[in-house]
Amino acid sequence: MYRRIFLLLCFSIFVKVQGQQFTDITNRSGIDHYFEVYEGMFGGGIAVLDYNNDGFEDLYITGGMQEDQLLENLQNGTFKNVLKTARLESVLRFVTQGVAAADFNRDGWIDLFVTTITTKSQKRKIPRAQNLIFINQGDGTFKNNSKS
């Protein structure tokens, strides 16, 4: 019995020594975002994608009552919010919830699907929410292809 405990301890120490270590770089990364909860909501969404096909993973983060962010990876451990220059500003009218990223039209560029709860102007009542689809144009911008 003691031998098993000893071996388990040795194995645990070995795994701990061989384990990866992480460094918190949040403050210098350029990511300054929080999700403001709308009543009845459970939390926000995030998609990891390479929206500009530069080989580095970018982030799309929903904001709920706050603004969403498309964070471009600057390839040095920092990110820059490019939501407006990517022509995604129409999402700012909505209380967003979730996001999915995929190449919907099979053109080699990652597109976005954003789910919403309501518009920010009608947040006192909850009508049927409009979901948003944005098609990547391949030039750093997206086209809102949602049904109006």
List each model region and its residues:
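Sec-dependent N-terminal signal peptides
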Residues: R4-I13
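Acidic, glycine/proline-rich Ca2+-coordinating loop motifs
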Residues: V17-S148
